[in-house]
Amino acid sequence: MELVVGRVAKSHGIKGEIVVEVRTDEPEDRFAVGAVLRGHKPREQTVNTYRVEAAREHSGRLLLRLEGVPDRTAADALRGTLFVIDSAELVPSDDPDEFYDHELEGLSVRLADGTELGAVIEVLHSAAGELLSIRRAGEQSGELLVPFVAAIVTSVSVADGVVVIDPPEGLLDPDFGESADGK
């Protein structure tokens, strides 16, 4: 399975640097000088290989210079490129409570009493923390967002394909978060 570890947001300066939106917990390893990156544009099958020539942080953003990208024009052509790895390249964690996003996607979600709720469709990362995006069983659209915290997500078994949640009252209500006047 292909996993995205970064995306080219835009070019930076005139010497061919690119700004990378990091989507990995290990940017210092994945984007180190000398690292070989595989990348492609969204919805394109052709995968290109790039070698990192220089890497630095600037104003909280990762800037890379890649071999064969000498100027702004070449860097602009990379805008939107997704840097990917194969999930088989990932080292399994020794921590039983640590998961890669792709391991959770597709798992069945049940309530503590065993009631089937739906399935994890995505793990969302926000400034406030991680959220499980859940598609309710029998529904084709819409999502339920559940904070991925120990107080609510009581157990995860990748081997059994199950996430068990014990949500606080009201979290699963369709109108949760709306005021009495519907706003």
UniProtKB/Swiss-Prot annotation:
Pfam families: PRC_RimM, RimM. Residues 95-171 form the PRC barrel domain. The keyword rRNA processing applies. Gene3D superfamilies: PRC-barrel domain, RimM. InterPro entries: PRC_barrel-like_sf (IPR011033), PRC_RimM (IPR056792), RimM (IPR011961), RimM_N (IPR002676), RimM_N_sf (IPR036976), Transl_B-barrel_sf (IPR009000). GO terms for biological process: ribosomal small subunit biogenesis; rRNA processing. Keywords: Chaperone, Cytoplasm, Ribosome biogenesis, rRNA processing. It is found in: Cytoplasm. One of its GO terms (molecular function) is ribosome binding. Disulfide bonds: none annotated. GO terms for cellular component: cytoplasm; ribosome. Binds ribosomal protein uS19. NCBIfam families: 16S_RimM. Belongs to the RimM family. An accessory protein needed during the final step in the assembly of 30S ribosomal subunit, possibly for assembly of the head region. Essential for efficient processing of 16S rRNA. May be needed both before and after RbfA during the maturation of 16S rRNA. It has affinity for free ribosomal 30S subunits but not for 70S ribosomes. The PRC barrel domain binds ribosomal protein uS19. This is Ribosome maturation factor RimM. It comes from Rhodococcus opacus (strain B4). The lineage of its organism: Bacteria, Bacillati, Actinomycetota, Actinomycetes, Mycobacteriales.
